[in-house]
Amino acid sequence: MLSLQFITHQTENYSYLESARMALEGGCKWIQLRMKEASPEEVEAVALQLKPLCKAKEAILILDDHVELAKKLEVDGVHLGKKDMPIGEARQMLGEAFIIGGTANTFEDVKLHHAAGADYLGIGPFRFTTTKINLSPVLGLEGYTSILAQMNEADIRIPVVAIGGIVAEDIPAIMETGVNGIALSGAILQAPDPVEETKRILNI
């Protein structure tokens, strides 16, 4: 079964919580609560409702960016973008029990995050995506192949999740580059039935 991370997104049709609930219903076991423009209070309110839903489905829940909140709410971990708290600092604050992921766009990013103690890397974007402002250079299949080859050469063993504008049809070719999983948002939420689409994608 595909290793799938669902990144929450608010649309005209669905709230952040509803988007996560549908992914869980479809069998996704890893939810990243991402509410970029929201206040910590708003994130906390949604996280408190989402945590028991994830627990009931035995799914991992990580927060995008909010390290202090992740510690307070005792979720599974955090994902840190390039402008968020440094991974080393987050590790000091959270200890070893929490999962810490980092965003990477280059092999240099990979080396830094690996040295700082990241548990996994979200590498991307695969292609242009509207869910992210200030997008880093697009990688495409060649970018993943190149970064993963450099990781192998440097003996850097850390799980890699491909992210950024990915649709279901891209998944087989992306997985062939050697990544460990895929992160999706719009590909699921834009489907006529997000629950069924999640199930379908997990079986690709």
Curated annotation (Swiss-Prot):
Mg(2+) binds at residues 65, 84. It catalyses: 2-[(2R,5Z)-2-carboxy-4-methylthiazol-5(2H)-ylidene]ethyl phosphate + 4-amino-2-methyl-5-(diphosphooxymethyl)pyrimidine + 2 H(+) = thiamine phosphate + CO2 + diphosphate; 2-(2-carboxy-4-methylthiazol-5-yl)ethyl phosphate + 4-amino-2-methyl-5-(diphosphooxymethyl)pyrimidine + 2 H(+) = thiamine phosphate + CO2 + diphosphate; 4-methyl-5-(2-phosphooxyethyl)-thiazole + 4-amino-2-methyl-5-(diphosphooxymethyl)pyrimidine + H(+) = thiamine phosphate + diphosphate. Its cofactor is Mg(2+). Pathway: Cofactor biosynthesis; thiamine diphosphate biosynthesis; thiamine phosphate from 4-amino-2-methyl-5-diphosphomethylpyrimidine and 4-methyl-5-(2-phosphoethyl)-thiazole: step 1/1. 2-[(2R,5Z)-2-carboxy-4-methylthiazol-5(2H)-ylidene]ethyl phosphate binds at residues 129-131, 165. Binds 1 Mg(2+) ion per subunit. GO terms for molecular function: magnesium ion binding; thiamine-phosphate diphosphorylase activity. Coiled coil: none annotated. Keywords: Magnesium, Metal-binding, Thiamine biosynthesis, Transferase. 4-amino-2-methyl-5-(diphosphooxymethyl)pyrimidine binds at residues 32-36, 64, 103, 132. The keyword Zinc does not apply. InterPro entries: Aldolase_TIM (IPR013785), ThiamineP_synth_sf (IPR036206), ThiamineP_synth_TenI (IPR022998), TMP_synthase (IPR034291). One of its GO terms (cellular component) is cytoplasm. GO terms for biological process: thiamine biosynthetic process; thiamine diphosphate biosynthetic process. Pfam families: TMP-TENI. The keyword Cell membrane does not apply. Belongs to the thiamine-phosphate synthase family. PANTHER family: THIAMINE-PHOSPHATE PYROPHOSPHORYLASE, THIAMINE-PHOSPHATE SYNTHASE. This is Thiamine-phosphate synthase. It comes from Bacteroides fragilis (strain YCH46).
